[in-house]
């Protein structure tokens, strides 16, 4: 038996036992790396002489309210990564600003009237966009969701910022239209040629189904503190922003 065959067999066995979950992360990073925005993002973050403004827009999961039980949410973890861990020494990017404007219950449709103000107020370099959970619950029109998401991406680009779309993580509520909304985010990202973080794909690999792992969730819709750790891990891997010896990215991810 050749060494290649042995390695293939071992990887297959690891995948079956749930310990080999890197495929979606690697694939998404490769997809993102082909885009001009990926190079632009890395040029910005590697320019240590110029602080960056990072803006997060989204719903209660972005806000991180209540369901982490006072522990950090994924936006706060990201702040730790960029402001302290990234660069040749701790605190190299200490002057970066990370703004979380997540609103409980928000949808892409609901965000649109406020988008111009937020973009003008904060003048971001990068905007992380995460909608879909409440859009599926409250509106239920996938085509409208895609249209509104595209409009948000367009406004971000007009503001000379880099948009990063996020596919929402899995839930345990069993709602039938969740996969359609995940596909909608992917479709908009491809159409608009923008960076994408696919939480749902990684969570599906971890659970082996379309339902989130119970120990990553606080209730049917909201991730707990561990779930938020998984989210920032996914962001870092898929955008290729992984500080060497990062304590944040070494957090347990069972």
Please provide the spans of the model-predicted regions.
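Alpha-helical cap/lid subdomain in secreted, periplasmic
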Residues: 76-86, 90-95, 106-252
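Serine-esterase "nucleophile elbow" of acetyl-processing enzymes
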Residues: 24-101, 116-123
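Sec/Tat signal peptide C-region and signal peptidase I cleavage site
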Residues: 18-22
